[in-house]
Structures are given as C-alpha cells and as structure tokens.
A protein has these predicted regions:
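Generic structural signal for well-ordered secondary structure
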Residues: 58, 93-96, 100
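Catalytic domains of carbohydrate-active enzymes, especially glycoside hydrolases
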Residues: 53-78, 113, 290, 294-295
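Short, cationic motifs built from Arg/Lys/His that form the positively charged side of catalytic pockets
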Residues: 74-76, 81, 451-454
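Glycine-rich, proline-tolerant flexible connector loops at the mouths of alpha/beta enzymes
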Residues: 77-92
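Aromatic- and Gly/Pro-rich amphipathic surface segment
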Residues: 22-63
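Active-site region of glycoside hydrolase catalytic domains
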Residues: 3-37, 85-87, 97-471
Length: 471
C-alpha cells in the first residue's frame, strides 16, 4: 500500500450542501476567541467551510493524483453527510451515497485503489447538546486528549458507540464490494476525554470488524489508526529515561493495541492514570482480539522523553498534574544539546533514524504487519514564500525520502513487515484552524482553487517507483 491521504473535514468544504449536517469543527469555527478556552479557534483562525472545495473538484483532484502514479487514495466520509440525523432508523442521505459512489468508481477507473476512513475528526454536533463549552480538553483537568469527540456521549438515549456502528454498517454494506482497505477511527486517543471514551472506541471498532468479516464477508482489511510521536529516551543509557519512554509509548499505543492485537488487558500505564477506565472482561477480550488486520500508525516525528521532576507514579495519582495523561517530560533537545532533527512549521522534526527503530518496536511488540497511514512535513514558514519557492520544497522531499529509506532498511535488514505508507497530504488544506501549516505535496490557490505540484510529490513517487520490485 503506497498512496496519499486526506480527510473530508479538511478538504471537502460544502459543509451545508447536499444534506450534510454540522460537525463539531464547523460549529467551533463560529466561536469567538473569547468564547474558546484554550482551543483551536483564535482571532486569526479560519473555519473549515470552504477548505479546498474537494467535494466539487474531486474528479480533478483524482485525475491529478492518478497522473502522478499514486496507487492508493485514502479519504474519509463524514458521518453527518450519510446520516444527517445521525441515529439508527433516521433517513439515509441517498444523494451522499451517490456522491461517494461516483468518487469511488472514478478512483477505480483511474487505476487507483480507494481506502476509507469511517471517522476522521468530524463528530456530529448533535452529541454535544448544542454546547461546545467543554469541547477543548485543557491540560491538568484529568482528560486524555486535546479535543473531545464525544465518544462517551449519547444523543436521544442512543450512545455514540451504537450510532457509529449503525453508520459504519450502512457505509460498509454499500461500498464493501469496491473498497479493499478500511479504518474505523483516526487517532482516537487525541479525541478521547476519559476511560469511557476509550472503551467506546475499542468496542465500536471490534463490532464493525466482526460485521465486515463475519456478516458481510468482506475480503479486504480493516484497522484503526493510532498516533504516537514516537518517544525516545533522552539518554538511552539511563534506565529512568528508558522507563519513561516505554511508559509514554505504552499509554498511547498499548491502550488500544493490547486488546485488539494481543487479546490482553489495558497496560498499567493507562490504568494507573485513568481511574474511570472501563474494565475489560474475558469475554470482551475474546471478542476484541484479532479485530485489526494490520497495525496502522501515524509516526510523524520522534519526541525526546524523560521522567517528570517528581515521579511518573506521583503524576498518575494527581488528576491536576500538568503533565497528565502521559506523565513524562517531552522535548526536542537531546543530551548533545542539539535538536532531535530539522524543524518544521509545527511539531514535526525530521527524525528518520528513530523511525526505523520505531518500526522495529511496533513489529516486535505486536507481531502484526505495520502500515504508516500518515506521515508528512510542513516546511517552516512556507506560507510566507512565493509560489515558486513553495513548489521547490526540498525539506519535505528530504523528510519523505529519508523516512522511506529507513523503512526499507527495516524491511530488508531487520525483517519488519512494513506493508504500506500514505503521504500526508496530497494538497495543502485546512489544518484544524488555519491554512498556514502546509503539509501538502501540492499547493492550492485559495482564491482560484488551482492546484500545482510541488517538487516533493515527484520525489516521493520517484523514490517508490525506482525501488518497486517487478512482479
């Protein structure tokens, strides 16, 4: 699997067209900076209303990707476009099904394979009861993620879990004959408020996996995608730093991966910090085990990890500790005094050596083929550059080529089953509040909506094709 990825809420626009109901990001965009307590919306923010108008321009976009030799096209479908009233038994938006029928068929016609994310950071607004006061999860408040996607919520006495499974079944039933790769959730830990949120995600995923494989006899593969700015110990010779990195990675990954891939309980890193976690019974674990066909990870960058000033245990026991929930110190400076890598516009640093180590860690821990379903690099200050300078994005090329090169070493020298990579993202788009963090391998003129290829797109494709084994 070698392809590109994007999410509906970041590219489609058309937020009120053809039956789509609001999602939390739409409504957050209406909030003033004064109403938003420490979240994504500021006085300088831009909403997602238009994005890059992919909903209308999808054929043009697919043509451009196919012309470059892309093999897999990862996209998402908004729940509220398929089911505007979100609940089981409410009307299905046939116009939306027709739209995605046309999109999927066009992807196939152009020689690519569609790969579908069912939920990518676009929670139906109905679950919030008209109140987004608690949308953002402030540090030191006992929450887990950054933004509450209401996985633990209910609407009209129907849980998010049950409503999401109903939506997923509708989409799978309609498109399973043409889509070979599926994901249930994107980076759910970042959107989880508490232990009940985690429980709802894991069980909803397992139910949809069983539906896909057991009930409709789907022949493709399904997973959910996890995130982890992979933690590396500040000093690999210091046991305390090693333990802190292990704690950090375990919390982010094993919380989901232990039950789903190994059929075992949540890790102690999670249970010691999240007091309201929902215990998993033996029956739960038997049902959840084996419900993902590959390990889907989005390892954009490494982060340097060390213990907190007190202890991990003390932090875990203190609900208001500012380092919760991970209870470690994260930084970008190594013991040499140097940055861990070349810096981007955001949190991403170019850290390819650690990428190889991380692939080994994932493979050796969970013994499941690993797919990198997002990785990308927003070049520093690209927003301020001329069009021609934006197109000549050598740091992004270096990022992709160096990571893929280390991935090949992991395959051929280490024996890791590294089975796929999806570049994030195929065009500059809405980055949850603004357009200044440019992850794209194409530029977008937001007045004319013209797309132009960047150098990194050619370099990404050339790297892959020049090393592709002939069948």
């Amino acid at each position: 699997m070698l392809g590109v990825a994007a999410a509906a809420v970041q590219i489609e626009g058309a937020i009120a067209d053809e039956g789509r109901a609001p999602v939390h990001n739409d409504v957050a965009g209406l909030a003033s900076a004064a109403q938003n307590v420490g979240g994504l919306v500021t006085a300088d923010s831009s909403p997602d209303y238009i994005a890059i108008e992919n909903y209308y321009l999808f054929k043009q976009d697919i043509e451009r990707l196919a012309a470059m030799g892309v093999k897999y096209y990862r996209f998402s479908i908004p729940w509220t476009r398929i089911l505007p009233f979100i609940l089981p038994g409410t009307p299905v938006n046939e116009q939306a099904l027709s739209h995605y029928d046309e999109l999927i068929n066009f992807v196939l016609e152009k020689g690519m394979q569609p790969a579908l994310m069912l939920y990518h950071n676009d929670a139906p607004f109905q679950f919030y009861g008209g109140n987004l006061t608690n949308l953002f999860i402030a540090p030191g408040t006992g929450g887990i993620g950054y933004l509450d996607s209401c996985f633990q919520c209910s609407y009209k006495n129907v849980s998010f879990e049950d409503a999401f499974v109903n939506y997923g079944k509708i989409v799978m039933t309609h498109f399973a004959d043409r889509i070979p790769i599926w994901w249930s959730f994107n980076e759910p830990i970042l959107a989880s408020r508490n232990g009940r949120s985690i429980n709802a995600v894991i069980k909803a995923h397992a139910r949809l996996s069983h539906f896909y494989h057991d009930e409709i006899k789907g022949t493709g593969r399904i997973s959910l995608t996890l995130n982890d700015n992979f933690g590396v110990p500040r000093n690999p010779q210091d046991p305390a730093d090693v333990d802190a990195a292990d704690h950090f990675n375990s919390f982010q990954l094993a919380t989901f991966a232990n039950p789903i891939f190994l059929g075992i309980d949540y890790p102690e890193s999670f249970k010691s910090s999240i007091s309201d976690y929902v215990p998993l019974t033996a029956e739960d674990l038997a049902y959840i085990n084996g419900t993902a066909d590959f390990f889907s990870i989005q390892p954009y960058t490494a982060t340097v990890v060390s213990p907190p000033n007190d202890t991990i245990a003390a932090c875990s026991a203190n609900i208001s500790h500012p380092l919760r929930p991970y209870c470690v110190t994260q930084q970008t400076i190594t013991t040499t005094g140097w940055n861990i890598g070349y810096r981007s516009q955001s949190y991403v640093y170019i850290t390819p050596t650690y990428f190889r180590t991380y692939l080994n860690y994932l493979w050796n821990t969970w013994k499941t083929p690993v797919a990198v379903t997002e990785f990308g690099f927003p070049v520093f200050a690209e927003q301020e550059k001329s069009q021609r300078d934006q197109e000549f994005d050598s740091p992004r090329s270096q990022y992709y080529q160096s990571y893929l090169n280390e991935g090949l070493k992991a395959i051929w020298e280490d024996g890791v089953k590294f089975v796929g990579a999806f570049a994030w993202t195929w065009a500059d788009n809405w980055e949850f509040g603004d357009y200044s963090q440019k992850f794209g391998i194409q530029t977008v003129n937001r007045t004319t909506m013209e797309r132009r290829y960047k150098k990194s797109f050619f370099d990404y494709v050339d790297f892959v094709e020049s090393r592709r084994q002939k069948s």
